[in-house]
């Protein structure tokens, strides 16, 4: 019977006085240690130590991991190389590892994932910054920037202050048509754009024409007044 299947608690004896020889057979081959499960915060506190036999078990100071090909150690920021692991057999012995058997990683490689993750967070922050909605009440009215758009992308209606309207009315009283040089001067003085000054004067001229037409239609003609005065 192989030593892997020998149970030390099984009450048995060998004939011809070979009981002393049974104690000399090692339970595990050289180079392998028994795997023990220690109680952790995730398990019960009263766990019994159990021994298991497997062709590939490695016991480390921080973490114990069982596998068929390779074992890894977490906590020391290094891993075992698959090429350095020798295939274990019941009759063979494991290969002892030194410092040269570890794959060391530089801090740049270790924190590479953290850098990528922080970059994604920064990109999301910039996207939210540029895609944030701008409401009409958040826009600055009567600014020299000029164009103000509404909710649906249309140009909003320009509102003028009382001071701006008064100055424009004064200018319209003296000059119904402005040169470009004068238009630029008024725009700079009232903190408006040249386009806004031009549109205001166009609308004001249309209003003035409508008012004059209404006045001429209500007043009697000059010929009728002369006839009445001659009679």
Curated annotation (Swiss-Prot):
PANTHER family: HOMEOBOX PROTEIN HOX, HOMEOBOX PROTEIN HOX-A6. A motif (Antp-type hexapeptide) lies at residues 134-139. It is found in: Nucleus. The gene is HOXA6. Residues 212-231 are annotated as: Disordered. Its main location: nucleus. Sequence-specific transcription factor which is part of a developmental regulatory system that provides cells with specific positional identities on the anterior-posterior axis. This is Homeobox protein Hox-A6. It holds the Pfam family Homeodomain. The keyword Aminoacyl-tRNA synthetase does not apply. CDD domains: homeodomain. Residues 153-212 bind DNA. It comes from Gallus gallus (Chicken).
């Amino acid at each position: 019977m192989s030593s892997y299947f020998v149970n030390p608690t099984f009450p048995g004896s060998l004939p011809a006085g070979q009981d002393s020889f049974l104690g000399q057979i090692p339970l595990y081959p050289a180079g392998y240690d028994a795997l023990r499960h220690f109680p952790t915060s995730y398990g019960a506190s009263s766990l019994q130590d159990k021994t298991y036999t497997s062709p590939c078990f490695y016991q480390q100071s921080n973490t114990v991991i069982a596998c068929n090909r390779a074992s890894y150690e977490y906590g020391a920021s290094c891993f075992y190389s698959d090429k350095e692991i020798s295939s274990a057999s019941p009759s063979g012995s494991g290969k002892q590892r030194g410092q040269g058997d570890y794959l060391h990683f530089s801090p740049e490689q270790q924190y590479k994932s953290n850098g990528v993750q922080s970059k994604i967070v920064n990109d999301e922050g910039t996207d939210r910054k540029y895609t944030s909605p701008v409401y009409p009440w958040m826009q600055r009215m009567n600014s020299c920037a000029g164009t103000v758009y509404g909710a649906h992308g249309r140009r909003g209606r320009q509102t003028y202050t009382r001071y701006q309207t008064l100055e424009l009315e004064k200018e319209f009283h003296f000059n119904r048509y402005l040169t470009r040089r004068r238009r630029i001067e008024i725009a700079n003085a009232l903190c408006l754009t040249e386009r806004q000054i031009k549109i205001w004067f166009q609308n004001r001229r249309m209003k003035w024409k409508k008012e004059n037409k209404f006045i001429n239609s209500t007043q009697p003609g000059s010929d009728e007044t002369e006839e009445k005065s001659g009679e």
